[in-house]
Amino acid sequence: MDADALSATPAAQAALEALRAAAGADGPMERHCLRQFAIAERLAGDRAFDRELLLCACWLHDAGLYIPSRDPYVTEGARLAARVLEPFGWPPGRLQRCMDACEQHHAPRSRMAMGLEVELVRQADLVDVTAGIVSFGLDRRWLRALFRDVPRDRFWRLVGGAVLGELRHRPASLTGVFFSPRRTRV
């Protein structure tokens, strides 16, 4: 899978560039987002979804980790999505769905009511972070092949560093990440 080839629209290219500006190119975060998108597409099955929105949300969902703030990093990710994507003239409802996908990706319960893409980002993130232990019915052979094709090396170091950074710099925000994510509006 090639991140640049996948990002065929100007909005997707801008989202990928925003991720790379924050986290670096072809690092563990970019590969996590790439795997997450592949997993989300697979989870969608034959259901119709907004592919560009899903890809942009996957690129931007964790980028808030790199933004200094007292607010939850998922909220910063939603704000970044708005800043990156507003210039492309997305209708407010579409932009809101992308922001929700970023902000709600650690929600403890389904976010299907906010849109299929929001729930796909949430489920796909959980599949990748758990290395397929949580699979939402995906074929484990397919997941193993994905993890070979888009390597997971240095991913756990990234996750550990992110958790420690959040605990050190904005510990009070963690409940807003995992238990009661807010909803930032367009």
Regions found by a protein language model. Give the residues of each.
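Divalent metal-dependent phosphate-bond-processing catalytic cores, especially two-metal-ion Mg2+/Mn2+ enzymes
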Residues: 2-7, 20-48, 60, 90, ...
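Generic hydrophobic secondary-structure packing signal
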Residues: 11, 29-32, 36, 53, ...
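His-Asp-centered metal-binding catalytic motifs of divalent-metal-dependent phosphohydrolases/nucleases
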Residues: 51-69, 73, 77, 98-106
